[in-house]
């Protein structure tokens, strides 16, 4: 049975697509209304729409917007057109010229009486329907105008009324003439003047100037000047605001009366607005003002591929008001399209249904196995049951949704011309034409997806059609190759369907009896031929149709030179940075081994480690032909884990292609190109990224199956995760190379732990097998190594030890090695030197010296020599005899350090005593200094052997010191105060020696001085207290005798001052206490004086005080003299005036003691004259400075 005989309606009948302008004749409209399928979804949408529309008929509403959304091809434009017929209730004639209104076509399609009633209510309401595609009605550059929407609304509104649409100010003139009743008269006059009808000529506004002006002046109230002025200024003065437009529409509706409606039906408004917030704002204001002004009498219906919420969200501004106006929102889904096609095209007659049911029953399992897709494909519908098969045959269910995606992809990527049919009717036509092509095929035939190419070929861009045409004319290709090529084009932009061999075979199935295995072979052969002709490209497992531009780009990419070394380098980067990312192998929680990375013969990164991971690729193997034996030898020789990858070069080929693409893009990055080429470059960049993902996958698989060689053996590691396989290999390598790694069982993690180890109360180290130290084997290894090098006189540093034991066969950590060095150092097995100075365990920065980079190359390590017991005994004996200490350590360093502590303590005591010698002579200073010198000699020695030898050398010196220093210390403890008193008496005598002539005093002083100045006076110091007592008593007695005449002089001077003061009673109280206190002070000091010379000096001090006091009295008396006054005359009082300055004699007070100085001996008259002469001369000299001299 032929397929065409199965259908209920003739498959070859003429079905129009969406009716365009010029096709709206009754015949086409009749067929459109008659065959329109009301699906369940459409029934629901119609119910919602007419329910909302009814509110504007029966009442008032400002929610007068309808937003119809749906994907490309969902039938929204057709739905909008049908609504326009229903709202207008358009009347059409059938073939028999019987008039039928649009609503009546739906009497049997709408089974819901409520919906049908609402439809009839709308149809019975007079309505002006304005249906238009906004893109075709707007000016070419209108999108840049923020008022573009309202201008289009105004244009179509004017056209609906018969006014000029393209020139809005002419439409305003026409509207005004209609109001004035002059419009028909004007048109007749214009035609009479111009010879052309007004409707024909008004578009040529600027060529009909004279005719327009003359007609206006003759038929309207305008004069010729006024008409000319309007003509010249009309365009400049014209402006249409949204508010003015809304009012104009309202006035029109009100003028019509009888509940008249106007409906604007705008197709593709969503696409027109796009992401332009200015256009969205303009639409919002237009709809809002119309809603407010017209109250539901004017409606706006629009279509968009996006729902309104998405459009508002995309624009990102506040368009909440427009959402409120478009309260009715209808969304068409793909299920609606499927249902329409099934009912209009694929509906079967009874014979066809029976035939197909039997066919499905016999082949259902075959169909399930035949129609399969790869696992990475999105859901593709297949025949679910018998009814499904009957409804869809000869098509397959997945083809409905897939063809929609094809149409959308072609449109989005610009592969279609301007006239690719839109919406449900496009799919309808495609399915009808494909069915027609296979109409004569027998039952069992299935329509391959490639058949849909012919249905859209006429609408495709020439660049696509050219590729197919050239393929058809290519003698190296056959017809089936071209069909595969067409298929690859159709699914080129469908991401949900990878164009791999499995999917291509399913899409190319033409009959239920097809052998899919053979089909794949046939398709694969076609793909190979197409690839050779550069018509397609293989990307991984997918095949991609290439446009002419893409073919050109691919040829350029293919010619890009890529060095194989760069390919290997990039593969290495993927292996070592993506697949196996670890930079260190974690052998255990404590041991992480760094390793070198090599691929073929190319090192990746620095090669500074003892072990490595080496990858052998097919490229390297092809040039060297390594067999297993050679790889085993290589693994032993290089201390590497070696992985030989399988011979599959997929990842190498992919990487080569990636590098070619990158090279092409780099060269073209600064070159201007067409938009098509730029798009291809973007896709190529994306392709390179996809290939990178595949490289990762291919390399991972290769590593899973790679042969592994370690330490001259091939490992039997099962196929599993590459990281686990490599880690297993590294473990074997470490176990073999680092066979003494297990010597370390207790680990050090921080420098703090080293410090704690350093201060542990353990000094003895035993290297025997019974030692409890968990790391004894490791410590012994380090000790033996230091011993060997010291024996050979080789200098070794901390750095050298660390380097040695971090390598094979040890592999120990730096901090662990440092701990072993510390243990040996504390155990006195080794010595450490920094800048030729020996270090001790008490060094504050010892851990830094052993671990820090700044020091490890400077700290020298030597095996330590043992100190003899005899030398250690010397130190112990001296400790006992010199310092009286017997509790001492038994180890070399401990004993040395303890003895040094004793020496430091003694040195501190000596320093304290030596301070006493700074200002005073004391006995025993030489003993202390000699002892200090000996101590410092030992303290400056850090080397243990040198220290013990030096102690032996200074043994006698220390014993002598111990004997000599005892009386010195005793002196400072008990005798120093008596000694200081004696020295004080010597100093007193020395100061008064001139005045003291008594022989007894001199004798006492001599005895005291003999004892004090003796080198070792300690045994005679007990005599000093008696001598001091005798000296003090006699010295005081002599001093008191010397002070007696001085006291008399002081008293005499005091009386002289009082006599003078008593002469002036008016000032006595002023000076008395002051003078008395001054003289009492001198007397008191005289009573406490200790020296003769101080007592004698007080006599002169008293004389000077006397003179100063008398001067004070004289000055005060002079100051108190009254000023000169003038007497009163008559009524005038005495005026006090300053005294007249007159010559005044200068007075001077001189002590009598200063007139005659020295001792005078008078034996005769001449001597008397001489003395008097001396007195005279002195007085004369004093008179030179004063007129009056007063002797006191």
From Swiss-Prot:
It comes from the Bacteria. Keywords: Antiviral defense. Coiled coil: none annotated. Induction: Part of the brxA-brxB-brxC-pglX operon. It comes from Bacillus cereus (strain H3081.97). BREX systems (bacteriophage exclusion) provide immunity against bacteriophage. A core protein of a type 1 BREX system. This system allows phage adsorption but prevents phage DNA replication, without degradation of the phage DNA. Methylation of bacterial DNA by PglX probably guides self/non-self discrimination. When the brxA-brxB-brxC-pglX and pglZ-brxL operons are transformed into a susceptible B.subtilis strain (BEST7003) they confer resistance to bacteriophages SPbeta, SP16, Zeta, phi3T and SP02 and partial protection to phages SP01 and SP82G (these include lytic and temperate phage). This is Probable ATP-binding protein BrxC. The keyword ATP-binding does not apply. GO terms for biological process: defense response to virus. SUPFAM superfamilies: P-loop containing nucleoside triphosphate hydrolases (SSF52540). Belongs to the BrxC family. The gene is brxC.
